[in-house]
Regions:
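Conserved AMP-binding/adenylation subdomain of ANL enzymes
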Residues: 256-273, 281-322, 337
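AMP-binding/adenylate-forming catalytic domain of the ANL superfamily
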Residues: 526, 550-573, 591-597
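A cross-family acyltransferase "interaction/gating" segment
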Residues: 1-43
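AMP-binding/adenylate-forming catalytic core of the ANL superfamily
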Residues: 169, 324, 442, 447-448, ...
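Conserved AMP-binding/adenylate-forming core of the ANL superfamily
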Residues: 85-132, 136, 153-158, 208-212, ...
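Conserved ATP/PPi-binding loop(s) of AMP-dependent carboxylate-activating enzymes
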Residues: 393-396, 409-416, 425-459, 492-494
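Gly/Ser/Thr-rich phosphate-binding loop
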Residues: 211, 321-326, 335-405, 418
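Conserved pre-ATP/AMP-binding loop-to-beta segment of ANL
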Residues: 81-82, 126, 189-237, 244, ...
């Protein structure tokens, strides 16, 4: 088998919806042709062929991600200085052109090279002018921005600061005043003071050079061209759904690879304007809400809080976004509080970070009239792994159509990512399997966690995701749950997510009101406990699930009503918090619904 890499964007690709009848970008284009070992006819199943082609594509893709993020951002900002790069309706400066963003970021970078001696610098700022300038300025200064979550518990926040060796935090004075429970470092720098104390003459000088000098001359005094692509560009922390957050050092290669991978799907049109309120401490918000549009020259429209529906509505009406980035938790909020016609210019909503329920997707489409596309990602993958696409991709013949999306799926893998499915218990590879524990390899995958934590998740260049997936014959990924969200009961693997879906269907409620966890059981190894915000007793639960042919082993033996399920700022369920509630109830025998134990 042969694999061709590097043709996307050429006249032989469907970039822009046209094939062949468009002007070439240049006279020469670097392409890579890769060949696999021969495969006999019996072994050449669709699944096996796909696995081999993905592996060839991943190896070829690595050959073209050798730049660094800071250099690439400087290049794109300087080459088109008059375009609108950022719209921040809540900021002092509502609109920043690319040249203006470049000028202020370079001016601050010069200042921070001298005043910030440490390599990693903490950042606690929302999306917008301040958050963008802080991250880009630190990159230009050769520093590593560490975007931190101010809503973490004090113990988790201290663990993050200690792991990263953070001594200085960039933030706003108002943010520091509001976040009284956050363990601030001894040195806190307010971004508004840094901008105000930068001489106007310095900003004007950098603005003039951005307009007048070619990129090659702009790069010379900065030293950005010498940055190793494999060096750390940004540090994020996992949400810690099942324990303390782990540090994820994302290299320049990781981030640029993911940006290029997403761009080669045709995800964003040239005139797209991305609306984002996702926090910058979230990989989805940092890469897709900041770095991707900067590198790919798309306008960013920001709102500081994803739960501020009034400001989101104002931004959507005033600034004509075409793409909205969000999570299912926030999309539920918009469905309830954003007026029907506020998103009139949106062409698509892109959902990530957690599984998008079919009912929510249908309701969003019915209310706002735009496509709702689901993707799958991981902080360790910088973050996008797979994505459903808007339109069917047409082949050369009119009859040839490759559909870009599939209901209920997380889409196909991005180009440049290889996958294999493992047995969840033995971790043995199962070539050609339809279902298993997902392992990934690609230029966007990190080499390991900070401080060599959880080394067992990285094996021979592969990252073991912890997600159990099913892959259909067309290559679409269907997420079945975290391997940690399966319980082995009486020798049978039971999916917590599947039980939650059955409960939501049985009680005609919205998903997200229930969490099923497994706790030790002396008889069967584990038993299921249901945490719910609904008013359900155990007998009603048993009766409703049994009537839907749900196996008895799958029916939770204990029901605990809670006013609210533990969750993080991103909307993701705090599984560790849920488990603690279940274990506490089991240990203390707190009051539960009448018939908890069979």
């Amino acid at each position: 088998m042969a694999h061709l890499d590097g043709l996307w964007g050429s006249i032989y690709s469907f970039e822009g919806g046209r094939y062949f009848t468009k002007l070439p970008r240049g006279l020469r284009r670097r392409t890579t042709v890769s060949f696999s070992a021969p495969l006999n006819a019996e072994a050449a199943t669709t699944r096996r062929v796909r696995e081999i082609l993905l592996t060839l594509g991943e190896a070829a893709f690595r050959l073209r991600t050798g730049a660094n993020l800071a250099k690439r951002i400087l290049k794109t900002l300087s080459e088109d200085p008059f375009r609108t790069a950022l719209v921040d309706p809540t900021g002092d400066t509502k609109t920043l052109r690319a040249g203006e963003l470049l000028a202020i970021s370079r001016a601050l970078a010069q200042r921070w090279k001298r005043s910030l001696p440490e390599r990693r610098v903490g950042v606690i700022l929302p999306p917008g002018t301040a958050g963008t300038i802080a991250n880009i300025g630190l990159l230009f200064a050769g520093k590593v921005p560490v975007n931190l979550n101010p809503t973490l518990s004090e113990s988790a926040a201290r663990a993050c600061l200690k792991q990263a060796g953070i001594e200085t935090i960039l933030t706003g004075a108002l943010i520091q005043t509001k976040c009284t429970k956050f363990p601030w470092t001894s040195r806190v720098v307010h971004i508004e003071n840094e901008i105000a104390n930068t001489p106007r003459s310095r900003k004007l000088r950098h603005l003039a050079t951005a307009f007048l000098l070619p990129t090659s001359l702009l790069l010379r005094p900065t030293g950005l061209g010498k940055i190793d692509p494999d060096s750390e560009a940004a540090l994020l922390f996992t949400s810690g759904t099942s324990g303390l957050p782990k540090g994820v050092p994302l290299s320049h290669r990781n981030l640029l690879a993911n940006i290029l991978q997403v761009s080669e799907t045709g995800f964003a049109d040239k005139d797209d304007r991305l609306l984002t309120a996702l926090p910058l401490f979230h990989s989805f918000g940092l890469t897709m809400g900041l770095f991707f549009p900067l590198v790919m020259r798309r306008t960013i429209i920001t709102v500081p809080s994803p739960l501020d529906c009034d400001k989101l509505t104002e931004a959507a009406r005033a600034d004509a976004p075409t793409v909205l980035l969000a999570t299912p938790t926030f999309l539920r909020h918009y469905l309830k509080w954003v007026p029907r016609h506020a998103f009139g210019t949106l062409r698509r909503m892109v959902s990530g970070a957690e599984k998008l329920p079919f009912e929510l997707r249908t309701a969003l489409h019915a209310r706002f009239g735009c496509e709702v596309l689901e993707g799958y990602g991981l902080t360790e993958a910088a973050p996008v792994v797979s994505l459903n696409l808007s339109m069917p991709a047409r082949g050369i013949g009119a009859e040839t159509i490759q559909h870009g999306s599939s209901d209920g799926s997380a889409g196909r893998l991005l180009p440049g990512i290889a996958m294999k499915l493992l047995d969840p218990e033995t971790l043995a590879e199962a070539p050609g399997a339809q279902r298993g524990l997902l392992a990934l390899r690609g230029g966007n995958l990190v080499a390991g966690y900070l401080g060599e934590q959880a080394k067992e998740k990285f094996r021979d260049g592969w990252y073991i995701t912890g997600d159990v997936v099913r892959v259909d014959d067309s290559g679409f990924l269907f997420l079945e749950g975290r391997v940690s969200r399966f319980s082995k009961i009486g020798g049978e693997m039971v999916s917590h997510g599947a039980v939650e879906e059955a409960i939501a269907e049985a009680f005609s409620g919205q998903p997200g009101q229930d969490c099923v966890v497994g706790v030790p059981c002396p008889d069967k190894g584990e038993e299921l406990v249901l945490l719910t915000t609904r008013s359900i007793d155990r007998e009603a639960l048993r009766r409703n699930l049994a009537s839907r042919a749900v196996p008895n082993l799958w029916i939770p033996r204990t029901v605990i009503q809670v006013p609210q399920l533990p969750a993080f700022a991103s909307g993701k369920l705090d599984l560790a918090g849920c488990l603690k509630l279940a274990e506490k109830a089991a240990a203390e025998r707190l009051p539960r619904s009448p018939a908890c134990i069979d």
